[in-house]
Regions:
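Acidic, metal-coordinating catalytic segment for phosphate/diphosphate chemistry
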Residues: 1-24
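Beta-strand-connecting loop/turn residues
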Residues: 3, 30-31, 103
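A generic structural signal for short beta-strands and their flanking turns/coil linkers
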Residues: 3, 20-22, 42-44, 73-76, ...
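Well-ordered beta-strand scaffold positions
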Residues: 12, 30-31, 73, 120
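A generic fold-level signal
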Residues: 19, 27, 41, 88-91, ...
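Conserved hydrophobic "DFG−1" position in protein kinase catalytic cores
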Residues: 26-27, 34, 98, 116
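Conserved Nudix-box catalytic region and its N-terminal flanking loop in Nudix hydrolases
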Residues: 27-69
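Unchanged
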Residues: 53-138, 142, 147, 155-156
Length: 156
């Protein structure tokens, strides 16, 4: 079940670890900010600002960096919202709430559009990733019920 690559000469383990994907759920009032992807995979699909964590940064710093790069948004980082293991692709997705301080955006080259959506206006069928959809469903359900909790689950 847990086969690892072990060097028979030096008796060391070659670790293959999952990648961390860091994301924000930028919100303003009853709306969330979505970015329309300008790169593959899933070009022209909508997503939350996201990307791979880089060496030397914390998960929240990485999520903040991605939000600045992809959306050009002004925001205040908040708390961890969802943690999802996606073993099929060797990733862990960490989503943070981020309160927007402006409704003006300056998307970077990876984003063709960035705009605010209310729950009923989200292009649910055009979302890039299942993890984004699951997070948004939790976000709006929690908002309706006045909850502020952290969710953790696996995506198969």
């Amino acid at each position: 079940m847990f086969d690892r690559a072990i060097c028979t000469v030096f008796h060391t383990v070659h670790y293959e670890n999952p990648l961390n994907v860091v994301v924000t759920v930028p919100w303003l009032g009853d709306k969330v900010l979505l970015c329309k992807r300008n790169i593959e995979p899933r070009k022209e699909k909508w997503t939350l600002p996201a990307g791979f964590m880089e060496l030397g940064e914390s998960t929240s710093q990485g999520a903040a960096r991605e939000t600045s790069e992809e959306a050009g948004a002004q925001f205040i980082m908040e708390d961890l919202f969802t943690v999802m293991s996606v073993p099929r692709v060797g990733q862990v997705h960490l989503y943070y709430r981020a309160r927007l301080t402006s409704d003006q955006f300056d998307p970077g080259h990876e984003t063709m559009d960035a705009r605010l959506f209310s729950e009923q206006d989200i292009p649910w069928e055009d979302l890039a990733l299942r993890t984004v959809k699951e997070t948004l469903l939790h976000y709006f359900a929690d908002r309706r019920e006045g909850r502020r909790v952290t969710h953790a689950f696996d995506i198969e």
